[in-house]
Amino acid sequence: MKTIIIKMLATTALLFSASTVFAADAPGRTECIAPAKPGGGFDLTCKLVQVSLLDTKEISKPMRVTFMPGGVGAVAYNAIVAQRPAEAGTIVAFSGGSLLNLSQGKFGRYNVNDVRWLASVGTDYGMIAVRADSPYNTLNDLMNAFKDNPTSIVFGAGASIGSQDWMKTALLAKEVGIDPHKMRYVAFEGGGEPVTALLGNHIQAVSGDLSEMMPYLNGDKIRVLAVYADKRLEGDLANIPTAKEQGYHLIWPIIRGFYMGPKVSDEAYQWWVDTFNKLQQTDAFKKQRDIRGLFEFNMTGKELDSYVKKQVEQYREQAKAFGLAK
């Protein structure tokens, strides 16, 4: 009997150890890669977690933020998968735009299955903005001018043709009967550059994400004509009308989060999952999320992995409608 009990205990211990992943200790060095130049949504996403992790003492040393522009995320994605696949302390920011690019095969030979999807930190919404002194006071003003003379309006965004910023603008063009491929669209690298171009009067409108406009909303330089949410947002943003209420069938939420290299150990990955699960419930994190104009959207680990892969498939179908994917 004693022998049987010992064998049962040994078997139970073996099964437990085989099916359970324990989190590793906190990485000694942490880094967040923002796949664009400073000033855009990726920068915002990295800074959010950089501040929150330190404020909550989940890490003892400041997280390094590194900018890796190129291909609207493709350079960073390829670097992590091919050159830095096992770095336990490195996370990379992604957004809905990253997933859209993946759906169109814009990240080269790598696809949605080639990284470890880690955590979301919130959702943003698409928007369109003009200079505060622009003659276009409403979305209808802008789109009517565009419809009358498509070449008179230059749209700018921090991403290339086929990106989510282009798709949002293309959907507006389609609603007023203009071929999206004929609109004047200037692609910049990152969300900060098109704002600079707008303020310099080099373009007439910026298609981007609402969070990217947050630093400018308290001043008198930028006017957001519409936010692509289902209903008006709350608080200080309640004065911004939705595209929907102005007669346009455009709703575009934008997830923001992080992924890791494909060869990061299960233990290291689990530390990050557990840390984000705790972090998302703290007042410090919620404060930083609110400051950056993001709305609650908490997912980690397997749940996020499933969401991301479904979203990529949905984006692929939308891209096909514009002839951007096979």
Each language-model region and where it sits:
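An extracytoplasmic/periplasmic, membrane-proximal ligand-sensing/linker region
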Residues: 266-326
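N-terminal (or domain-start) structured segment
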Residues: 23-114, 161, 178-205, 296-299, ...
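C-terminal lobe and pocket-closing loops
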Residues: 212-281, 310-313
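Bacterial N-terminal signal peptides that target proteins for export
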Residues: 1-9
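N-terminal signal peptide c-region/cleavage motif recognized by signal peptidases
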Residues: 17-23
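Hinge/capping helix and adjacent helix->loop/strand transition within the periplasmic-binding protein
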Residues: 26-27, 55-59, 79-90, 102-193, ...
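Short coil/turn segments
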Residues: 37-39, 96, 131-136, 158-163, ...
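Ligand-binding pocket segment of bilobal, Venus flytrap-like solute-binding proteins
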Residues: 69, 152, 157-160, 164-239
